[in-house]
Amino acid sequence: LAQPLYAEEARAIMQRVLDRDNGASEVSRTKLATCRYVKKSQRLVCAEDPRVKVFESVRKDFPVAGGKDSKSVMLIREPAGEQGIGFLQYDYEAQGRDSDQWMYLAALGKVKRIVSGSDDEPQTGSFFGSEIGYEDMEARHLDDYTYKLLKTDTYRKRPCWVIAAKPTPEHARKSNYSRSIQWIDQE
């Protein structure tokens, strides 16, 4: 009997996450450090110097019936050898509509469309050569997942819900993930 209640509560929490007001636009500068990990003394540590990329991004929301669509662009600023590589993404509010993504390759002066996987296969590729996939960059739709509240916990002295998100059978065919665990700040 408690299981459906937890599922309903988890879905309501995720709806609040998606509905939060994050403004009609955003400008940011981000540093992304990635490395190959190895296990050492029961801990994961970088096996080499991290690869560091700095990029700037701009996002703008556009009102549509029932919500908003978003357009964003990201440009690599560092390292110098990759400066000017860009990523453009359109996210759509409409359920079932995939994001559109393009990559600008500065050295070639060319734009390449990043093709979504077909309806029966996930999208492949990594974002700016990191562990982050193009799927991770797309907007999430509430109905593409089922949710389960696993527990409440504390992270850095802040209360959190720990929620498992499992893709629906239809969405699972297009996803690289069988489930994800999300820590949601309760405030």
Predicted regions: what they are:
Residues 36, 148-154:
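Long, terminal "pre-/pro-" and other extracytoplasmic accessory regions
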Residues 100-104, 110-116, 121-138, 152, ...:
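Gly/Pro-enriched, hydrophobic low-complexity segments
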